[in-house]
Amino acid sequence: KTLMEYYGVKYYVATGEADHLIAHLVKSKKVWGCLSDDMDMFVYGCTRVYRHISLLNHTVIYYDTTAILHDLEMTFDEFCEIMVMSGTDYNIHNNTSIHETIKIFTQYKKYMKNKKNKKMSFHLWVSQNTEYIPDYDEFLNHYKIFKLDKFEEPVVNNISFKYEPIQRDKLQEFLTNYGFIFCSS
């Protein structure tokens, strides 16, 4: 925090889960995207996610969720259902995998293509036609974690992203404590 303050960078401490705050900022277009290696950011609804940043190689991988969904020919809800079924930070001990979930999703798509009533969600179809989800209520509880319809974070309304000036003297003094050496000018 001190380093960011001396560099003039704004930061906010979420009262709850930081992922919720970040996703809300992205979805409300207060920020353009998020930098996180946490795959859950996709399920929270972040439309632009940067992952695997390398300061050494000057690289980062950019994911555009809208383009991904278009390429995969699936809705955001289907995408979320697949991700939650395959395992998140909240249900990592499930005996599921992304590969198996995609196989089942392909079966679901074939089934729905031939069905007149196309209102059945993927997760409901899975619970009625397979034994892939052993505890449907538990799945629904995990799935609901990612629905941020009623996000309440008091700081969000007052967030300002105006950078402050760099405090060079304080920054230099701070970094010297960590072994950085500076030339006098």
Residue ranges: model-predicted function:
Residues 1-17, 21-25:
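Noncatalytic, basic helical substrate-engagement surface that gates or grips nucleic-acid strands
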